[in-house]
Amino acid sequence: MDFETSILKLLQESFASIGVDGSFREHYSRVYFNAMTHFVELEGDIPAGIMQMLRFEDSRGLRGGYFYGLFTLPQFRCRGIGRGLISDAIATLYCDSFDYVVLIPHSAESMRWYRKVGFETIADNHISVLGFDGTNLTTGKDNSLPAMYYALHDNFSQIPTDNVIKIPQQDCFDFEF
């Protein structure tokens, strides 16, 4: 299996692991795949973990990143791969002067893990993330779980409280299949 096929397979496993249905996966692949920045962690020449990120500006003019689909193959878990993917993505946004990161955990277990790596809960706030074509990108998420955020600089004091984050149409990145 070639590298690109391996990454696409990893992405499909990521969606399947949180119960995202096939029609959303197909729509996502067609519309959003090239708009996202993908972080991939390799173990040798095997893609062992993946995470996607969309950049946005919220209604207050603050710049953020939306993390989505963090997934590590089961045989590579508990080796720091997920933490490394998060760290790389945070460093990328920090260097580009972004304000915060937001994500919606898919389970109570993942919420505990995100807390361990520095994310905080947005108290009693449930958000929706809408893509540039109106697709709700929070499909497949446990809607009872609150969103979480990570501040990218010390003077960040505005906890994001928007109910809806809209992802603008973005240029495609170099990562294509």
Language-model region placement:
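Conserved catalytic-core motifs of GNAT/GCN5-like acyltransferases
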Residues: 102-104, 120-148
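Conserved N-terminal entry element of GNAT/NAT acetyltransferase domains
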Residues: 1-5, 162-171
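Short hydrophobic/aromatic beta-strand or adjacent loop that forms the aromatic wall/cage
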Residues: 36, 142-147, 170-174
